[in-house]
Amino acid sequence: MANYLAQFQTIKSSSDRIVIAVEDVSDLWLNVKDSFEQRLPVKKACLNNKARNPVLVENLPAEFIQTTDSRLRSRFPQEQYLFWFREPYATVVLVTCEDLDEFKTILKPRLKLIVQNDEREWFIVFVSKAHPSNDQATKMAKKVYARLEADFNTKKRERCCKFDLHGPDDEFWDDFDSKMVDCIRNTLDKRVQFYEEENRRLSEQRFTPIWNFCNFFILKESLAFMFEVTNLHEDSLREYDELELCYSES
């Protein structure tokens, strides 16, 4: 792991905001990109600090990156946990469909494959292309979306929201922001728990022959930097203070 120190510093310098991945199933990103990016930074995001207490973050720096982007696709599995702070905190799945049979036979199976990874926090945005003056298209879009909700929402969690390409309303944006923040918060909680467990495991080795400060440093600073990027500054400073203390005692 010591070999990753230089790489860690390089990655850290280029990771000044959290990543929201975009899974563009129906080639819609160019149609909605400007509208989505106007929602950034994420406003009034309620996150949990290290003590699991809610903290309101007024402005959370974030960027949308497509899953086909080389910045995501080039990452190796063995690096994922070391540099977990730079992995996407949410995945927005963009879809559209204008036919119920097509939804059942093509789109639904494809979506099932995409979202079956339980490690990833995701939600689906159904983009309706129906013009308000076209009653038939509008009714079909509503039917397809209702089927989407029935198949992917659960009693515990709603995973779908509907974007009207000809003029999304405030209700959609409130729903979109809420689902995005839920994903970010859940991802952050999981990663904090992982880093804490790993750091605890390494701390137990401090006074043994296998102790390696470099390993501990990368994991501890990764946690500190993740707090820093998500604007949980008190937690970040606390991690850096603990890291400095550990170094002075090594």
Regions found by a protein language model. Give the residues of each.
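Eukaryotic intrinsically disordered, low-complexity segments enriched for acidic and Ser/Thr/Pro residues
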Residues: 1-214, 218, 250
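TPR-repeat structural position
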Residues: 233-234
